[in-house]
Amino acid sequence: TNIGPGNKFFSFCVIGEDTPDLKYKGEKSSLEIGNNNVFREFCKVHRGTEVDLGYTKIGDNNLIMPGVMIAHDCVIGNGNILVDNSALAGHVQLGDHVTLGGYTLIHQFCKLGSYSFTGLSAHITMDVPAFTRVAGMPTKQAGLNTIGLERKGFTKEEITNLKKAYKIFFREGLKVDEAIKKIE
């Protein structure tokens, strides 16, 4: 486990332990932690597996709240907030500035784009596009993450343009390549 400067670890964190993945047979693997992250009480972060990346990676300036579990081979970007008792199964990828509502569960191999937001108790089983919100039971698209974008300093013009792109991509019933052409 390699840990950068400025990280804070609170009571009962489990950092860099063997993964419980059944394919793991004790081979060399690692956990890479960037700078200035906060790991609150009872969070757990596993190393990677040789079958995939061979490492788990956490970027810089993340807040990992109590009870959060980050499984093997996850890649976490920068500036994310993982709220209490959220769980990331193996091979999950988070972009930058993602917020996970409390008790969010993310199925293995899912990707959450930068500036996305999950509501309380979301059960993520598919990728979540950048800049969007998902919420509810079952979890569904809930629109653009406008509040998060405003808090991160996006201009009104940038948010308006993202709203237009979101509408074209998710509300007009176009095929992906058609939506991309229309947005361009």
Give residue spans per PLM region.
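Terminal amphipathic alpha-helical/low-complexity segments used for targeting or macromolecular assembly
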Residues: 6, 12, 23-24, 28-30, ...
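Structural signal for interior beta-strand "rungs" in well-ordered beta-sheet cores
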Residues: 1-140
